[in-house]
Structure formats: C-alpha cells, structure tokens
Amino acid sequence: MSDIHEHKILILDFGSQYTQLIARRIREIGVYCELWAWDVTEAQIREFAPNGIILAGGPESVTAENSPRAPEYVFTAGVPVLGICYGMQTMSEQLGGKVIQGVGEGEFGYAQIEMLTDSLLFKGIEDAVNSEGKPLLDVWMSHGDKVSAIPEGFVAVAKTDTCPFAAMANEEKQFFGVQFHPEVTHTRQGMRMLSHFALDICGCAANWKPSSIIEDAIERLKKQIGDDEVILGLSGGVDSSVVAMLLHRAIGKKLTCVFVDNGLLRLNEAEQVMEMFGDHFGLNIIHVDAENRFLDAMKGEADPEAKRKIIGRVFVEIFDEESKKCANAKWLAQGTIYPDVIESAGSATGKAHVIKSHHNVGGLPDDMELGLVEPLRELFKDEVRKIGLELGLPYNMLYRHPFPGPGLGVRVLGEVKKEYCDLLRRADAIFIEELHKADLYNKVSQAFTVFLPVRSVGVMGDGRKYDWVVSLRAVETVDFMTAHWAHLPYDFLGRVSNRIINEVDGISRVVYDISGKPPATIEWE
C-alpha cells in the first residue's frame, strides 16, 4: 500500500478567510497537506518535512510593525514556496523586496492579469490574449497593499493596470508569488496553477484519494485498537456514520454504537438509522429511546442557549450510563474532522479567533478513562462525504442539508413540547419532499421548517380554527457565513403551504422567511 502521507504540502495560515479553501484544493488535486499557524518553529517544519510550502493570505499589513512573518527557515529549507496575496507580500519583504500601503488603489474582486514572461507555475495557462498577443488570465483579487519592488533573483511574471507585480518568480529557487487568490473559483484556472505547484514543481504524487484514505484509516485503526472494544455515539449524521462504517470494516463486532433518540429528530429518522446501520450493514447498535427524558429536562425552558446546554448535558448523562454497561470498551470513537482540529489549535500568538464549541461528545465526563479514536481528524467535510460514498453509504444521506446538533430543540421556538415536535416533523417532511419533487432540493443550500409558538385564526369548511403557525426557511450560500434567502417559485410555495395546512391537523398558517444573513442567522435559534 502506498503511503498517502509520503508527499505533502505545508500551508502557513496568516488569517485569511480563504486559507482552508487552499488546503481543500490541494487535497482535491490528490496531495496531502496540513494547515498550521504562521508562527511555527524550524524544528516543527523539519519534522513535518514538506515537499513544498504555501504562504496563505491574511488581513494584516506587511508594512505594520509586528505583523506576521514567515519563519526564516521557509526560505532556506530547499523546497518550493508559493506566496498567495499576503504570503507574496511577506515573501517579498523578507527576501529584500518592498511593499507599500495601498492608498485607495486596492483591487477587490474580478481582475485580468497580463502575463509578462513564462513561468512553470503558469505553464500552458491562458484565458484570453490581448492586442499585443500577450496571454491574459481571469483572477480574483483582494488586496490593499502591493509589492513595489521585487527581491533580487525574481522576475515580474504578471501585472495589472494598478499592480506592477501581480505575480513574481525566482525559477531557480522555485519561489513563486501571486497577488491574487488561485484557490477561489473566480480565478478560472486557479486549480491548474495549484496543480502545477503541487505535482510538477514540488514533485508530489497524487496519492490522496478516497480508496487509499480508507485503506490507510483501516490499517491505522487496527494498529491503534488491537483486540480492544470501541464505543461510538451514532447520531445518523455524516461524521458519526462514516466513523461507524470505518470502524465496522476495521474491527467488526468489537464496535458498539449507541444511538440516542432524543425525540428531536426528523420524521422517521430513528427508524431509518436503525434499519440502515443495524439491519442493512449489520452493526451492533444500542437504541436508547430517551424522548421523555429530554422533553422533561427542557420543560418550561424557552431560552435557546439554555435548551442547547440541557440537550448536551442529558446526552452526556445517557452516553455515560450506556458506556458503563459496555464494560469491555477501552476506546471512545468520535467524528472530529480537520476544521475542528484547526479551530481548536488556533495560533500560539492568539491571532486566531475562538470559534463556538461544537455540539459533540466533547463534553464527556473526565472519569470515563477511555482512549480517543478519531479516524476523520485529518479530513475536511467534503472528503468525509466522498469516503462515505466509497464505503457504501447512500448519497441522499451524505449530501442532505445540515441539521443542528440539538435538532428540533432549536427549531421549535420557545418551550419544546412533544405536540410541537410532532407537528413540525410532519410539516418539515412535506416541505423537503416537495423540494425533491420540484428538483429544487439541491439548488438550495439548506431548507427547513420552524415552529412558531403563536396561534392564528384559520377557516376550514364552515368552521374557524385557531391553530399554530410554521415558517419555511430556505437559503443559498457558499460558506454558511453569509446567505441569501432562496427565491423559490410562488406556485411551489403555495403548493407546500396548501399541503401542510390540509395534511397537518394543528397548523393553520404557513409563512416564508425572507431574511438574509446578516442580519438574521440561518437558524432561528
């Protein structure tokens, strides 16, 4: 079996919102890479032994005192280096070039760069040709400062009207700088540039692919676990499902999955999880029906954050009780993925922001004394999904819209009651079913229904009824950081509304949420 970590790229993070995207692109090319904070030590880089280094972008200004710098060793390690945006600026500054602060001359958004000379990084790449026969490339810029003088040994490779050094290269040392962002899709041939860097310039082999990752993960799990038993909290979500399948392949019946039905799941979800993993795949699953326990614990509580905490606490209590029954279990498996690891690691200098804690089994009691098994901790979400497909999990389960950890606990506004959850489940199932029928489900990023604790007058036949209100929510987004409300067709919305009001006894009014993010969040609570 080839070593999927044999060839690798190190990406140093200077705080850009696009940095994780660079890592995902390199992985898509088929090369393993890791994302570290910019302030790593020479010893750490030596130990990692990368075949190439990428200096990512960042929000700081190279001209400011105490702004981040690449470790000097990056430029003496003898491996190719690619600086992107801020990464190009700090490379230039550190190697003897000059960077000036942009005063109203920044470039943000689409730009066309003119190629001035050939470079390995841009070999065979052009989007258009200007009147002088020079190749032009469509790229995405996002910078205020710019390089005003390049270091000795470098040549200008590309320019724009306002940026004399849109790309630079020292081909002998294999140092390259680009002022634009090749990792974003708006840079039309960005993937080809990154591919040139990783495969041709750094000489990496494209070993990083789903089948090899699975093989490697199973091998490592067998080594780590040996003949021991493992316990896993299976939610039916993407991460825990893929962990379950990997462990099942590696250790078979030595895996015990605990599926806690908290009464806050989607329609028929508990039955589907048990059928798929228990009956179809033959996993060993303990099904805990804890609906009443969760609902009792939340009785009278209307505050969203308090509800989240209660749901988390009760889950931990139940999981702790069940794990004690599995006396032979020595390991706890978790669905930690690479972005969780990056967020937790932060930066030694405190430049990285602290992100909210995840609703995961992370808060388990300290006295559990179980070793931790995290087979997905090197993987991004899109990689986890691809592996899931390879392991035989159904596409519609791996690629369905995000569902919050606390489930309907945060989609029933205010106090959570069984009656509200049952109504919401049925209304939501109709909305999702109609989206699939109209071929709209995959055209929106997330769609769901929210239960509003207000009654509204309705007329049914000759009688009036005074029933509950639900809101439909559908958004379009690239990264879930910002989102637009989805402009679904009126006739479609009318059809969904009619079905819900006619088929779900207890709901008399359906509204559609037309709020973007910001200012509204995607979920209501």
UniProtKB/Swiss-Prot annotation:
Domain GMPS ATP-PPase: 208-400
Active-site residues annotated for this sequence: 85, 181, 183
Enzyme Commission no: 6.3.5.2
GO molecular function annotations of the record: ATP binding; GMP synthase activity
Keyword Plastid included in the entry's annotation: no
Record's keyword annotation contains Heme: no
Pathway: Purine metabolism; GMP biosynthesis; GMP from XMP (L-Gln route): step 1/1
Entry's Gene Ontology cellular component terms: cytosol
InterPro entries listed in its UniProt record: Class_I_gatase-like, GATASE, GMP_synth_C, GMP_synth_GATase, GMP_synthase, GMPS_ATP_PPase_dom, NAD/GMP_synthase, Rossmann-like_a/b/a_fold
Top EC class for this record: ligase
Entry keyword set: ATP-binding, Glutamine amidotransferase, GMP biosynthesis, Ligase, Nucleotide-binding, Purine biosynthesis
Domain Glutamine amidotransferase type-1, residue spans: 8-207
Catalysed transformations (reactions): XMP + L-glutamine + ATP + H2O = GMP + L-glutamate + AMP + diphosphate + 2 H(+)
Quaternary structure note: Homodimer.
Function (record text): Catalyzes the synthesis of GMP from XMP.
UniProt-recorded name of the protein: GMP synthase [glutamine-hydrolyzing]
UniProt lineage: Bacteria, Pseudomonadati, Pseudomonadota, Gammaproteobacteria, Alteromonadales
